[in-house]
Amino acid sequence: MAELLLGVNIDHIATLRNARGTAYPDPVQAAFIAEQAGADGITVHLREDRRHITDRDVRILRQTLDTRMNLEMAVTEEMLAIAVETKPHFCCLVPEKRQEVTTEGGLDVAGQRDKMRDACKRLADAGIQVSLFIDADEEQIKAAAEVGAPFIEIHTGCYADAKTDAEQAQELARIAKAATFAASLGLKVNAGHGLTYHNVKAIAAIPEMHELNIGHAIIGRAVMTGLKDAVAEMKRLMLEARG
């Protein structure tokens, strides 16, 4: 069974800051608190429209984190150049639409193999580990392995949004099957999107899971309980699921 890690996404600390155009709350300070509470890494999504995390945030976080930085980004020339310059520990390549509220689905790796292969090589040559954010689909998983990505991150949005227990169980089985298949190809498996304190345990219990990236639920809980307690509680639930 893979060691299970928690990556805390702090995008919505920046969302709150940017809502009033202030210098607070500071994502860098939030990252420090999350690390102290047990986060194994910090995830930020530098979107093309800079709606929350900024270039400055990325630079400072890269210089100050004690754990690992995971930079989520679209597969564009601008973002690849920023990543190569900044050199985060990990880059997770994601699809991106300007009009979306949050990432709506996985990358179509199978439909753009050459583009993805070039991006993975460019990042790997800069010493960056690459993850591809994809749906729990065998064709996409095979394509991810073929283009040279060492990691995938399985999109858990459909599982999180399931309206019935039966639908959620079906989505969970699909994710578990995908994780097993990915591991059989030598890929390391992460997961994220829509995971909460109520639904995380079943995903955490999947033996192949290496890291869960969770943000909105933790920041939402932090408003009520404080960030340190919110991160610690999520980590406790994940590890409890592993027995």
UniProtKB/Swiss-Prot annotation:
Catalytic residue list: 45, 72, 193
Oligomeric and partner information: Homooctamer; tetramer of dimers.
Annotated NCBIfam families: pdxJ (TIGR00559), PRK05265.1-1 (NF003623), PRK05265.1-2 (NF003624), PRK05265.1-3 (NF003625), PRK05265.1-4 (NF003626), PRK05265.1-5 (NF003627)
BP GO annotations: pyridoxine biosynthetic process
Binding, 3-amino-2-oxopropyl phosphate: 9, 20, 194, 215-216
UniProt name for this protein: Pyridoxine 5'-phosphate synthase
Protein family per UniProt: Belongs to the PNP synthase family.
Lineage start: Bacteria, Pseudomonadati, Pseudomonadota, Gammaproteobacteria, Enterobacterales
Function (record text): Catalyzes the complicated ring closure reaction between the two acyclic compounds 1-deoxy-D-xylulose-5-phosphate (DXP) and 3-amino-2-oxopropyl phosphate (1-amino-acetone-3-phosphate or AAP) to form pyridoxine 5'-phosphate (PNP) and inorganic phosphate.
Annotated site, Transition state stabilizer, chain positions: 153
Cytoplasm is among the record's keywords: yes
Predominant place of localization: cytoplasm
Gene that encodes it: pdxJ
GO cellular component, one term: cytosol
Keyword tags: Cytoplasm, Pyridoxine biosynthesis, Transferase
UniProt-listed HAMAP family: PdxJ
Pathways per UniProt: Cofactor biosynthesis; pyridoxine 5'-phosphate biosynthesis; pyridoxine 5'-phosphate from D-erythrose 4-phosphate: step 5/5
Subcellular location, record wording: Cytoplasm
EC numbers, comma separated: 2.6.99.2
Entry GO MF terms: identical protein binding; pyridoxine 5'-phosphate synthase activity
Residues that coordinate or bind 1-deoxy-D-xylulose 5-phosphate: 11-12, 47, 52, 102
Reactions accelerated catalytically: 3-amino-2-oxopropyl phosphate + 1-deoxy-D-xylulose 5-phosphate = pyridoxine 5'-phosphate + phosphate + 2 H2O + H(+)
